C-alpha cells in the first residue's frame, strides 16, 4: 500500500529532516510505526509525557475562562500539582491581551502548507506574544533553543499568517516575541524577540528547505550517532537497541518533538 503524498510541513517534520533525513522519510513519507522505545526508563518517560500533555489541557481550560479552582482539582499528580501551582504564581503580562489558546496557523510553502499549532498567542495593539509551555525535567540552554525550527517557524508563521488574530492587520516581525515557559523552572523563561531581517532569513530558509524536500530522492542517515539513541526508528537503521536517557534536557526536547500533531485532522486559520 502506497503512503499518501505529504501535504503539510511542521516544525517537527522540518526538524526531523534537518536532524536526520532518513528519520523524516520513515516517519512522514513511509509513515512507519515506532519500532523502539525512544528513551529510558520507558514507563517513567511515557507517564511524564502524558502529564505534560494533560498540563497543556489544564492551561487551555483556564485560558478559555474556566475558574482556576475548578481546573486545579484535576491536577491530581505531584508533577501536575507543582506545574499548576507554578503556572498560577507566574506573572504573565497578558491581562489586557486578546488570548488565542491552542490556535493553528498555516501558510503556503512551496508545494506544501506550513502548519503550526501554538499553545498560546496573545495580541494587543499589534503586539504579539507567543507562549509555549514546556514540562522538561531540565531546562534546555537558550542558545540551543534559538536555532531550533520551532523557534524560527512559530515567529515567522505568525508574521506571515497571523492577520486573523490582529483584526485582519499584519503583525510586523518587530512586534513578535516568543517565550518558552518551563513549568519546573518558572523564573527562567527563554525569550526570543524578532525582527525583519530574521523573518526574511527564516522564510527564505524555509522555502529552500521545502523545495529540497520536494525534490529529494535520497534520504541520508545522520552522522551524529548520539541522535540515534533517542530515535524510535533506530531499529530500521541498525543504529543500536538501547534507548538513551531522556533526563538530558535537549534530548528530552528532541524526544518530545516525536509526538507531533496530525495536521491533516485539525482546524486552522489559513493564509
Regions from the PLM with identified roles:
Residues 1-121:
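Metal-dependent nuclease catalytic cores that hydrolyze phosphodiester bonds in DNA/RNA
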Residues 3, 118, 162, 226-229:
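Anion-coordinating catalytic cores for phosphoryl-, nucleotidyl-, and glycosidic chemistry
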Residues 7, 146-147, 171, 224, ...:
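Active-site-proximal structural scaffolding
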Residues 30, 63, 67, 135-138, ...:
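Hydrophobic/aromatic-lined pockets within catalytic cores
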Residues 42, 46, 141-145, 222:
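Short, solvent-exposed segments of well-ordered alpha helices
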Residues 60, 207-271:
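Accessory terminal regions of nucleic-acid processing enzymes
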Residues 83-84, 133, 181, 233:
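Tryptophan-centric aromatic hotspots in well-structured domains and transmembrane helices
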Residues 103-208:
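Mg2+/Mn2+-dependent nuclease catalytic core
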Amino acid at each position: 500500500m502506497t503512503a499518501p503524498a505529504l501535504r503539510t510541513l511542521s516544525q517537527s517534520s522540518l526538524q526531523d529532516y534537518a536532524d536526520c533525513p532518513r528519520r523524516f522519510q520513515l516517519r512522514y513519507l513511509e509513515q512507519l510505526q515506532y519500532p523502539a522505545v525512544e528513551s529510558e526508563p520507558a514507563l517513567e518517560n511515557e507517564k511524564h509525557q502524558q502529564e505534560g500533555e494533560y498540563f497543556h489541557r489544564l492551561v487551555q481550560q483556564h485560558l478559555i475562562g474556566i475558574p482556576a479552582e475548578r481546573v486545579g482539582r484535576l491536577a491530581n499528580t505531584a508533577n501536575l500539582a507543582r506545574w499548576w501551582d507554578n503556572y498560577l504564581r507566574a506573572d504573565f503580562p497578558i491581562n489586557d491581551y486578546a488570548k488565542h489558546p491552542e490556535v493553528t496557523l498555516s501558510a503556503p510553502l512551496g508545494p506544501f502548507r506550513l502548519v503550526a499549532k501554538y499553545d498560546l498567542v496573545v495580541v494587543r495593539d499589534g503586539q504579539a506574544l507567543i507562549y509555549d509551555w514546556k514540562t522538561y525535567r531540565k531546562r534546555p540552554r537558550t542558545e540551543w533553543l534559538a536555532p531550533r525550527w520551532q523557534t524560527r517557524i512559530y515567529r515567522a508563521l505568525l508574521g506571515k499568517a497571523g492577520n486573523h488574530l490582529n483584526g485582519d492587520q499584519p503583525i510586523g516581525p518587530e512586534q513578535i516575541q516568543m517565550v518558552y515557559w518551563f513549568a519546573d523552572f518558572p523564573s527562567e523563561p527563554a525569550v526570543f524577540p524578532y525582527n525583519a531581517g530574521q523573518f526574511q532569513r527564516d522564510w527564505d530558509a524555509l522555502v529552500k528547505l521545502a523545495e529540497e524536500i520536494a525534490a529529494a530522492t535520497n534520504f541520508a542517515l545522520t552522522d551524529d550517532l548520539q541522535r540515534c539513541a533517542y530515535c524510535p526508528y533506530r531499529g530500521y537503521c541498525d543504529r543500536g537497541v538501547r534507548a538513551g536517557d531522556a533526563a538530558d534536557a535537549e534530548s528530552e526536547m528532541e524526544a518530545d518533538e516525536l509526538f507531533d500533531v496530525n495536521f491533516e485532522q485539525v482546524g486552522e486559520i489559513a493564509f
